[in-house]
Amino acid sequence: MLHDDTNNLDRVEVMITAAGRITVLTGAGISTASGIPDFRGPNGLWTKDPDAQRAATLSHYLGDEEVRRRAWQNRVRWIDRDPQPNDGHRALLRLQERGQLRGIVTQNVDGLHQRAGIEPRIVHEVHGNIHRSRCWDCDDMRPMRETLQRVIDGDPDPRCALCGGILKSDTILFEQSLVPEVIDAAFRASEDCDVL
């Protein structure tokens, strides 16, 4: 079995070395090494706190002020954490530096690809980005730290400063449609490559 795995890795290395255009798909696994838990694994956020999934469901989030308050408090607990890109992110950066990386299609919302130095324009975050908050009504976007500071200052369910609408992280929740422009860009990156 080890021999087969080694042969497979050798073949992958040859493919990557020869490729002119590479698009990479990433998910939670690349960021767990940076200390960001996944959702469903043994130490996942929803495994440890099944009620947290309610905050990730659009109808519950929009319809229940207590769900929103709890979600904002959970985000505040993360404000001082400073996850850093890991070897996986840096390996992708090396592909970019060699001119091979055409795109990253990711389910991750942590922004670690960009923080590693990868060009933001080639990172297609299909589930959004946790570093922004967005008004559900008027689409106004603000840095997440600005919104979290309001929570820290005593506003348990901050509302949009422009229209009074409900604020949420700029991430995709269950029952929420993916952003068509992001999906289109992800498809283009997946089609315009030698290796996916």
Label the model's feature ranges.
Residues 1-196:
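Conserved catalytic core of sirtuin-type NAD+-dependent deacylases
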